[in-house]
């Protein structure tokens, strides 16, 4: 299950209590205080990792707790510190305070780690309170409670390429062709119900770093007002380096390619106007279903209405035009 939003209560460990104890040895009848300090409670940290793409493993949890510190002991022994709890999250995770909505941290890199809840300090044993005027203190202090925090985790996928388009535009078929995977494909809206990630290797380039591609669920008119799958997945578009609009040029589904592209761009800009500054390419898909003359006519009309856009013709089903798309990725995404 793809889980990209979750609320959790995080509870750091309590510090162990300090103890009152006395040194008891045969030749030291007045051995003095000998009670040790309590150990510190475990803290809760959050760390971003690669190869994790959802919060699925936390979906049935309401809270997470680090270990408490152990109490001190006689012989001036300090209690064991509680073990820290490290919460692993995907790159692209936003951490917010659930009570205030304040952004605590934006995790964008593998290995990025912060302390979210500090463990409580251990209490002091009676050895700590020994002074020149108080040689036999009977005081010890309890451990401090650990911090408790209610947090929200929200994922914005980080990918090189984001596939966006209307339901049934052929995104999933194209995704399968490019990533050599098997995302579910079907002839009904919203076949893709959650973002899918794949690695794109060009033929003969298997030893170079692949591109990460995200297949974003189908967008419909009104998505920016949360219709359809709406805002749940539009946010995953924000962090992609290249937006690949997949448009059904065949007209078989009674779509107008020009109208589809106009609505699609309008929805993205209504969601966040800054998306207009992203690198975009328009993939005119399903060309295998058109005669050459029909292709030329429809492409000419699109270029006339969208003169500033870059178009590429292809078929996710037959693979026609895919090599040219690989070359385009290479030119756009090379560092």
UniProtKB/Swiss-Prot annotation:
<feature type="binding site">
    <location>
        <begin position="315"/>
        <end position="317"/>
    </location>
    <ligand>
        <name>GTP</name>
    </ligand>
</feature>
<comment type="subunit">
    <text>Monomer.</text>
</comment>
<keyword id="KW-0479">Metal-binding</keyword>
<feature type="binding site">
    <location>
        <begin position="285"/>
        <end position="288"/>
    </location>
    <ligand>
        <name>GTP</name>
    </ligand>
</feature>
<feature type="binding site">
    <location>
        <begin position="190"/>
        <end position="194"/>
    </location>
    <ligand>
        <name>GTP</name>
    </ligand>
</feature>
<keyword id="KW-0342">GTP-binding</keyword>
<dbReference type="GO" id="GO:0005525">
    <property type="term" value="F:GTP binding"/>
</dbReference>
<feature type="binding site">
    <location>
        <begin position="165"/>
        <end position="172"/>
    </location>
    <ligand>
        <name>GTP</name>
    </ligand>
</feature>
<dbReference type="GO" id="GO:0005737">
    <property type="term" value="C:cytoplasm"/>
</dbReference>
<feature type="binding site">
    <location>
        <begin position="215"/>
        <end position="218"/>
    </location>
    <ligand>
        <name>GTP</name>
    </ligand>
</feature>
<keyword id="KW-0963">Cytoplasm</keyword>
<keyword id="KW-0460">Magnesium</keyword>
<dbReference type="GO" id="GO:0000287">
    <property type="term" value="F:magnesium ion binding"/>
</dbReference>
<dbReference type="Pfam" id="PF01018">
    <property type="entry name" value="GTP1_OBG"/>
</dbReference>
<comment type="similarity">
    <text>Belongs to the TRAFAC class OBG-HflX-like GTPase superfamily. OBG GTPase family.</text>
</comment>
<keyword id="KW-0547">Nucleotide-binding</keyword>
<dbReference type="GO" id="GO:0042254">
    <property type="term" value="P:ribosome biogenesis"/>
</dbReference>
<keyword id="KW-0378">Hydrolase</keyword>
<protein>
    <recommendedName>
        <fullName>GTPase Obg</fullName>
        <ecNumber>3.6.5.-</ecNumber>
    </recommendedName>
</protein>
<feature type="binding site">
    <location>
        <position position="192"/>
    </location>
    <ligand>
        <name>Mg(2+)</name>
    </ligand>
</feature>
<comment type="function">
    <text>An essential GTPase which binds GTP, GDP and possibly (p)ppGpp with moderate affinity, with high nucleotide exchange rates and a fairly low GTP hydrolysis rate. Plays a role in control of the cell cycle, stress response, ribosome biogenesis and in those bacteria that undergo differentiation, in morphogenesis control.</text>
</comment>
<dbReference type="InterPro" id="IPR006073">
    <property type="entry name" value="GTP-bd"/>
</dbReference>
<feature type="binding site">
    <location>
        <position position="172"/>
    </location>
    <ligand>
        <name>Mg(2+)</name>
    </ligand>
</feature>
<feature type="domain" description="Obg">
    <location>
        <begin position="1"/>
        <end position="158"/>
    </location>
</feature>
<dbReference type="InterPro" id="IPR014100">
    <property type="entry name" value="GTP-bd_Obg/CgtA"/>
</dbReference>
<dbReference type="InterPro" id="IPR006169">
    <property type="entry name" value="GTP1_OBG_dom"/>
</dbReference>
<dbReference type="InterPro" id="IPR027417">
    <property type="entry name" value="P-loop_NTPase"/>
</dbReference>
<dbReference type="Pfam" id="PF01926">
    <property type="entry name" value="MMR_HSR1"/>
</dbReference>
<dbReference type="InterPro" id="IPR031167">
    <property type="entry name" value="G_OBG"/>
</dbReference>
<dbReference type="InterPro" id="IPR005225">
    <property type="entry name" value="Small_GTP-bd"/>
</dbReference>
<dbReference type="InterPro" id="IPR045086">
    <property type="entry name" value="OBG_GTPase"/>
</dbReference>
<dbReference type="InterPro" id="IPR036726">
    <property type="entry name" value="GTP1_OBG_dom_sf"/>
</dbReference>
<dbReference type="GO" id="GO:0003924">
    <property type="term" value="F:GTPase activity"/>
</dbReference>
<feature type="domain" description="OBG-type G">
    <location>
        <begin position="159"/>
        <end position="334"/>
    </location>
</feature>
């Amino acid at each position: 299950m793809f889980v990209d939003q979750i609320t959790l209560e995080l509870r750091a460990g309590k510090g162990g209590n300090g103890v009152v104890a006395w040194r008891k040895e045969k030749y030291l009848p007045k051995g003095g205080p000998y009670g040790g300090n309590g150990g510190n409670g475990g803290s809760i940290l959050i760390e971003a990792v690669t190869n994790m793409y959802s919060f699925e493993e936390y979906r049935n949890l309401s809270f997470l707790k680090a270990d408490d510190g152990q109490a001190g002991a006689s012989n001036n022994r300090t209690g064991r510190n509680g073990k820290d709890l490290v919460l692993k999250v995907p790159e692209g995770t936003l951490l917010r305070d659930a009570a205030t909505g304040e952004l605590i941290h934006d995790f964008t890199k593998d290995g990025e780690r912060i302390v979210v809840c500090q463990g409580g300090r251990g209490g002091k044993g009676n050895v700590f309170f020994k002074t020149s005027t108080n040689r036999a203190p009977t005081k010890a202090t309890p451990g401090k409670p650990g911090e408790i925090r209610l947090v929200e985790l929200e994922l914005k996928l980080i990918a090189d390429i984001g596939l966006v388009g209307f339901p049934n535009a052929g995104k999933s078929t194209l995704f399968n062709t490019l990533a050599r995977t098997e995302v579910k494909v079907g002839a009904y809206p919203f076949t893709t119900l959650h973002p899918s990630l794949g690695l794109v290797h060009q033929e003969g380039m298997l030893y170079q770093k692949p591109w990460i591609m995200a297949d974003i669920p189908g967008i419909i008119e009104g998505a920016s007002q949360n219709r359809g799958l709406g805002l749940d997945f539009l946010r995953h578009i924000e962090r992609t380096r290249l937006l690949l609009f997949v448009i059904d040029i065949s007209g078989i589904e009674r779509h107008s390619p020009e109208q589809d592209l106009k609505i699609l761009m309008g929805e993205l800009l209504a969601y966040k106007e800054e998306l207009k500054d992203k690198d975009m390419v328009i993939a005119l898909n399903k060309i295998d279903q058109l005669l050459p003359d029909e292709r030329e006519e429809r492409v000419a009309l699109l270029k006339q209405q969208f003169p500033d856009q870059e178009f590429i013709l292809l078929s996710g089903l037959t693979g026609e035009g895919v090599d040219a798309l690989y070359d385009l990725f290479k030119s756009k995404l090379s560092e």
